[in-house]
Amino acid sequence: AAPREWLHVLGVSQLTWAVYLSAIQRGIRANVNEEFTVSFDSASPYMMAGRFQQYAITPHISGNMDDWVLRHQLLPMGYAVANAKKTQPFPQSSPVANKLSLQDFNPRRGQFDVKTTDDLSDEVLCNHNVYVYLRAFRDANEAVFKRDGVAAQELKDACSFIESLFAMKDWQSALELRKESLQAILNREPVSDIDSDIER
């Protein structure tokens, strides 16, 4: 049979899962198939913008697992925001959102407008969220796999172990011995209320 070259995982929004999947890819490439790819997707950036009008907050990746979470905040909206006399900047930073103010996100300024945002606002919010997620996944991987990465040693050791599984003959026994500690690391990463709603 032809070798399998791609594994895609649905619905990954946790940074720890992102680095675990990278460790799997590294282990397979080093020991089984150097062309193998592990990928994943996440609907959260789009659902946050479209359903919840939430913007993603860039996490501060550090050695503290409490920092390894993608948090979200409600976009300031409404008549008062749309008609504010002083231009207010967008609360977070991303290439597209940096060019717009909160008033740009709220172009409908009528007293009786039920919704002060529009379709362009939703699209820009999606763009911002996707950027924050992608950057966070990249930063998380660098924190674990770069020589001077700032991730907790426990997480680095876990990823190193995952990589090593693909060189073991009796990997099942090794994984059985470590599975609870691997799961414990995943359980320590906070999950925001929005992600909890999405998962339900």
Where are these regions (language model features)?
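Glycine-rich phosphate/ribose-binding loops and adjacent secondary-structure elements
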Residues: 1-104
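C-terminal extensions of enzymes
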Residues: 71-200
